Amino acid sequence: MQTSKIIYQENIKSKLMGNINYGGGMSSIFSSESVSEGHPDKLCDVISDSILDACLSLDPNARVAVETMVKGTEKKSFIFISGEITTSSEIEVDYEKIARIAAINVGYNDHDVGMDASSSELCEVTVKITKQSPDISQGVDLGKGLHEGHGAGDQGLMFGFACDETDSYLSLQEVLMPLPIALSQRLTLAMTEGIKSGLIQWGRPDSKSQVTIEYGSDGKPKRADTIVVAIQHLDMLDSFENEHEEHNFIESEITKKIVHNVIPHELIDENTRILVNGTGRFVKGGPYADAGLTG
């Protein structure tokens, strides 16, 4: 069973990495990305999830399919909520209030940051929610529809696997995820927690990361090839001579307080590249910089 498990994992990994032949002495690299809760797309996920949680708390049998879009402009930000929600009884859910609270909790309570969800003047919420289509619901309800015994509403394809390649690292044991995505997720989580705790006082909600891991010929993680971090920040030019000095400060802070506290030290060597805000400044962020969508 253990041998089959290893072969299965390596076959899956081989496909993801481009059919690398580990037995031929070749190494390979694999990259994974993660975004923080302040990223526009993830903000939409948070809002949709918050609405789902509210509906299920009132009706455990609720059927909820909610899509959210956010976008900011110079003068105003917008949250668009649409979808289909069906409950077993008439319940009242304040979708706008839920959306605003969710965005505020993420950190969007200042228009200069990307959105001020606390202000009805600076942030407009539009809600277009209907009940689930009867043509769809009859495919979900047992005893209804063309096949009365099915009770399935849709078709889909899913795949995935658990792996133990993180178990060699104390802080990542029993994660059961590939190392690149596990580290990427922990980088964005560390930045979010650092902002909320005050460790990174100049940080703003929108951030993302990407980790590239080099795998040896045996298919096991060997080293961190590249670590990329982007974090939205306060305009600090008043405190520095120029943008270059501002960037050096941000790079030093993130490398010291985030990267070296998240990435296991044995994965970092003299050839590991650490790139922080590689495009330069990242003051304008969130829904103002990019439209966000659920999913």
Segments from the language model and where they lie:
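Intrinsic-disorder-associated, low-complexity terminal segments enriched in Asp/Asn/His/Tyr and depleted
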Residues: 8-11, 19-21
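Short glycine/threonine-rich loop-to-helix capping motif typified by GTGT followed
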Residues: 89-90, 281-295
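N-terminal low-complexity, intrinsically disordered segments
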Residues: 39-42, 94-98, 135-137
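N-terminal, positively charged regions that mediate nucleic acid binding
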Residues: 19-65
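Short, charge-patterned binding micro-sites
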Residues: 66-88
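Glycine-rich, mobile lid/loop segments that gate access to catalytic sites or pores
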Residues: 31-35, 70, 74-76, 104-287
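Active-site-surrounding "flap" and adjacent substrate/cofactor-binding loops of secreted or lumenal enzymes
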Residues: 85-103
